[in-house]
A protein has these predicted regions:
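N-terminal low-complexity, acidic/polar interaction/targeting segments
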Residues: 1-240
């Protein structure tokens, strides 16, 4: 998983751009199951449904952009507008590979956070009008302290659990942008999709970091309890 600082933003012609292109008034919408997208990150996706493959074919011939939106119920395979969250992320196809089983695997570069304002098409795939939801950030000593606390706690978690790759440690330690840091950690942390969505929907970076502090503290508590249980079990086995 990469931060925005590691990525090269390209246009429809494949040439580098100076920054994210302006948000268009409408885009195709790709529903996601069990995945909450975040800005600044590269997101691996596997697509197999006919309507999703049609969407990809069409956006590839345009500017390669679409909106990624998480479904409210991961058990629904083909959610309609009523079963999707209103806030998602613009994605740009960075790499695409078709596999023998007929599905497509792709890497999508997360862009701006957007809100769906109106659904304009349901077939052959979803299309909606959108508006950008930019971050609200005010530099302060409080924000700096929150960034340091989030980094410190997350790095402690990385050293304690196997599900977080070691390269995350270096990435988190070197990110200076508070918003990018929050997106990376929110995506990597083992929390529920609903909790990830709440973090995505929070435009105030300071409030987002405060919520992350709470979630990170909870994860540390869970890790501590798990370690204590393992120690107790091992002690009983040694006695036996």
């Amino acid at each position: 998983m990469s931060s925005a600082s590691d990525l090269l933003i390209v246009g429809a012609d494949g040439n580098p751009l100076d920054g994210p292109p302006p948000v268009p008034p409408a885009l195709a919408v790709l529903p996601l199951r069990e995945t909450v997208p975040f800005p600044d990150l590269v997101i691996p996706l596997a697509v197999g449904q006919e309507r999703s493959l049609k969407l990809l074919d069409d956006v590839l011939s345009a500017d390669r952009r679409f909106v990624m939106v998480a479904g409210r119920d991961p058990g629904v395979e083909a959610p309609g507008p009523e079963q999707l969250y209103e806030i998602g992320v613009i994605g740009t196809i960075a790499r695409l590979m078709k596999v023998p089983d007929g599905s497509t695997r792709l890497l999508v570069q997360g862009g701006q956070r957007v809100r769906i304002t109106r659904w304009t098409q349901r077939e052959p795939y979803l299309v909606a009008t959108i508006e950008e939801l930019p971050d609200v950030v005010q530099e302060s000593d409080e924000l700096t302290a929150l960034v340091r606390e989030v980094q410190r706690t997350f790095l402690e978690i990385v050293e304690s659990v196997p599900y977080l790759p070691e390269e995350l440690r270096l990435a988190v330690a070197n990110i200076e942008d508070a918003s990018q840091l929050s997106h990376l950690i929110a995506s990597a942390l083992r929390i529920t999709p609903a909790e990830k969505q709440q973090l995505l929907e929070q435009p105030d970076v300071e409030l987002r970091l405060r919520r992350l502090v709470q979630l990170l503290a909870r994860e540390l508590d869970v890790i501590s309890i798990g370690t204590r249980i393992q120690d107790q079990v091992q002690s009983e086995l040694d006695k036996g």
